[in-house]
Amino acid sequence: MIKIGSALLVDQGSGLVRTGWLKALAEDIAQLRAEGREVLIVSSGAIAVGRRSLHLEPGRMRLDEKQAAAAAGQIELAHAYRTVMADHAINVAQLLLTLDDSENRRRYLNARNCLETLLRLGVIPVINENDTVTTQEIRFGDNDRLAARVAQMACADALILLSDIDGLYTADPHRDPEARFIPTVTALTPEIAAMAGAALTPHGTGGMVTKLLAARICMDAGCAMAIAPGKDDHALRLLRQGGRQTWFLPAEEPRTARKAWISGALKAEGTLWVDDGAARALAAGSSLLPPGVRTVEGDFQRGAAVRVVGLDGSPLAKGLIAYPSDEARLLVGHRSGDIEALLGYRGREELIHRDDLVLDSRFRHRDEDGEGHRS
């Protein structure tokens, strides 16, 4: 899978598609296809292209104007991709996805089935966020994480983020002359996260922050990811010839498709704060039971994705909760045997069953290093 940023695809001055660059990319993709590889593309650029055709001022667009620009730009981008790929007898298809399409299990599976069918028919899917219907609260916010979610959805072997940077450094190389290049990452440790220059929260923004968040989704799903320079023509060819790039290698034991979907969920609807005993039980593979929960935050329904954090706020896990928020609050601190008396019906013993629970990779590494929670 290849992710193409707006700055690579669209000339920032004129607002036109960089046709020569796109033709060179199409040649590289045609070569990959000739070698028997399936290719998917996640493409930005619709708003930038549409803004020009609608004569809208950059930096001053309202939400409705951005949505209009996206609608106009999608047609131009689709035409550009179809034109350059037709030179190689390759069909393309456009998929517009929203955050909810990846968070809702049924819609996620429907989108995955569509991708699989297109690939079986020899078509290259070109995917973008559906900016015409999304708002700031219900969007990916960047195509790095969209690309990672789709790579997970399509069971891709690798995701290549073509960018204006050539990989990960220990610090910003433009500001720190002693910054060292990192060619390979095998685990997203706190040290690696610190290199992004900001916290890796689900709502994190900024170039390297979103790329590391995308890497976490990919690695947990068993998909390798690369950050590679893409400004020059034939970026993929240069990459294969040994050009500089940072590879994030997947976990040795990738999660099941269901757990990878839970782990990759970007929108947690609530937070459960748990004590040290519960944290140790989670690390040992147990379900989350009511006695170990101290606080329930948020308003959510049964089956919602929630975060599980320690008393110090450190991330422990993400899971699908078995009770709505009002009932979960009633169960806090109580034994599982008290559930029927508290709720008036006999519910599940656990708030989150271990089959619906995924440990945070940072918590797993802390536990393996002997730095887990202690009483």
UniProtKB/Swiss-Prot annotation:
Molecular function (Gene Ontology), one example: RNA binding
PROSITE patterns: GLUTAMATE_5_KINASE (PS00902), PUA (PS50890)
The UniProt record lists the keyword Transferase: yes
Reactions performed catalytically: L-glutamate + ATP = L-glutamyl 5-phosphate + ADP
Every PUA domain range: 269-346
EC number(s) recorded for this UniProt protein: 2.7.2.11
Pathway entry: Amino-acid biosynthesis; L-proline biosynthesis; L-glutamate 5-semialdehyde from L-glutamate: step 1/2
Annotated GO biological process: L-proline biosynthetic process
SUPFAM superfamilies, per the entry: Carbamate kinase-like, PUA domain-like
UniProtKB keywords: Amino-acid biosynthesis, ATP-binding, Cytoplasm, Kinase, Nucleotide-binding, Proline biosynthesis, Transferase
Entry similarity comment: Belongs to the glutamate 5-kinase family.
Purpose of the protein: Catalyzes the transfer of a phosphate group to glutamate to form L-glutamate 5-phosphate.
Name of the protein in its database record: Glutamate 5-kinase
Gene: proB
